Each structure stands twice: as C-alpha cells, then as structure tokens.
C-alpha cells in the first residue's frame, strides 16, 4: 500500500482536533469517527497519514467494516493487522435469503461486543454511516455517499448506554484514486481492482454536538434523525471539498 502513496503531496487537516482526540483517549473516553469511505485500503491510508505525527492512534482504531473485507480473497490483505468489527450491510443481508437470519444474528452479536468496548472506554472507532464506498456521479465526480440516519442513531444510543464519555467527530477521506471501486455495486464477490499511485488526504473536523444541530427541534423522531444525519453528512462533505481543491 505505502509505495502507492505520494506522501510528499498528501495532507492531514484538523491537527488541533486530533490532539483533542488523543487527549480524550488518554482519559479513557471514547471517540467515534463518522466518516466517508472510498477504498478498501482506507484503514492503511489512515495509518500512513497519522502515524508520523500521532504514532499509535491509527493502530488502536477499531474499524466497523463489511464482511467482505474478510471473505473476499482480494480484499483480505487490505485489512490485515487492523482491528475490525465486521457486520453485514443492508445491501447484502438479504442475499442469499436463506442466510438472512444467521447474518442478522451475527450483526446483533457484533453490536453487543461494540457496546461492551464502549463501556470499557478508551476506544477510537471508525464508522462509515453510508454503509459503502463513495462513487462517481454521472458527470464523473466522486460524491460522498449519503449517511444512513439509523446507523448514526444506533451508534449514538450505544454510546449513551455505555455511560462512558463518548465524543463524535466528522472525518473526511480522499483516497479514491488509489483503488477506485467499480462503477456499480456488485453483489457477487470478484470485482475488478485497478490501482494507481497518488496522494491521499484526511480531515478531522470539530466535535459534533449530537443533541443540538440544525433540525434538532423537530419533534418527529425519524425526521430529527434524518436532519442529524444530513447535518453530519454536510460537515464531512465540506471538509472533503477542502481536501480536493
């Protein structure tokens, strides 16, 4: 992975926020990164970007990932040496239908483990609420995929239930050019992968207030969750635009 990265022209934005995060973790608090996701090697990309200034931070991060990172032979190497909690995403949980119940049980057990980790504290967790990688639109522009309100709500509720101080931060990643995903989402394993060398970028924004945000006054729970997801998504999109200019 590292030989593909043009480190000289890569960048990290938001050092003051990352320093704040390191301080939270030292105190035994939890940090949850709500991030976009562009390539299967994002965990390695994060390490390459953070290790020089924040040694150990990326290494201790727990990545909530789709099951393909451990079932697709070509994806497995990208996740080796990472702390993973694997779940079945909504788009794959029904395929094949006869395995749906087993997949749901697996997801339930994974979320129970996540709750235990949050309760212990001192955890840094990466979550991509989109449930998948960013892709190009019809004009060939890479767009940050929409965030799932229910996914964000689930992690927020687990954090509150843990009763350990937990802080949420937006993270924007620009890694797409290194290993672009296929234009369409494939159900079957075996997508084509083409790599190229280039720069990568990461931004960590200010902590997110999960209770006070544009639309937090909405009384309908579902609509309020949508407003929060939209707000967090807009924060990540704004930081992402700053990375690619």
Give the positions of each predicted feature:
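Membrane-anchoring hydrophobic helices of lipid-metabolizing enzymes
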Residues: 1-31, 37-50, 58-59, 69, ...
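Short, flexible loop/turn elements at secondary-structure junctions
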Residues: 35-39, 65-70, 172-177, 206-208
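Short, well-ordered, mixed-charge alpha-helical segments that flank or form enzyme active sites
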Residues: 41-43, 70-74, 95-96, 134-137, ...
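Glycine-rich, phosphate-binding/catalytic loops in enzymes
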Residues: 48-52, 143-145
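Short helix-capping segments at alpha-helix termini
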Residues: 53-57, 163
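Active-site cradle of extracellular carbohydrate-active enzymes
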Residues: 65-109, 113-115
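Non-catalytic C-terminal accessory region of glycerolipid acyltransferases
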Residues: 100-245
């Amino acid at each position: 992975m590292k030989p593909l990265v043009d480190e000289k022209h890569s960048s990290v934005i938001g050092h003051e926020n990352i320093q704040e995060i390191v301080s939270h973790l030292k105190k035994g608090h939890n940090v949850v990164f709500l991030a976009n996701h562009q390539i299967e090697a994002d965990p390695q990309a994060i390490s390459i970007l953070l290790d020089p200034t924040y040694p150990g931070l990326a290494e201790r991060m727990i990545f909530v990932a789709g099951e393909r990172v451990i079932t697709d032979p070509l994806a497995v190497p990208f996740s080796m040496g990472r702390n993973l909690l694997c779940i079945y995403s909504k788009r794959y949980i029904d395929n094949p239908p006869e395995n749906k119940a087993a997949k749901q049980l697996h997801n339930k057990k994974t979320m129970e483990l996540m709750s235990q980790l949050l309760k212990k504290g001192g955890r840094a967790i990466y979550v991509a609420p989109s449930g998948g990688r960013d892709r190009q639109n019809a004009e060939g522009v890479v767009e940050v995929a929409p965030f799932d309100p229910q996914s964000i709500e689930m992690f927020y509720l687990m954090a509150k239930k843990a009763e350990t101080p937990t802080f949420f931060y937006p993270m924007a990643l620009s890694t797409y050019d290194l290993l672009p995903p296929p234009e369409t989402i494939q159900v079957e394993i075996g997508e084509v992968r083409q790599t190229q060398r280039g720069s990568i970028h990461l931004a960590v924004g200010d902590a997110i207030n999960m209770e006070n945000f544009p639309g937090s006054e909405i009384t309908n729970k579902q609509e309020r969750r949508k407003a929060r997801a939209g707000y967090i998504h807009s924060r990540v999109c704004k930081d992402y635009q700053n990375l690619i200019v």
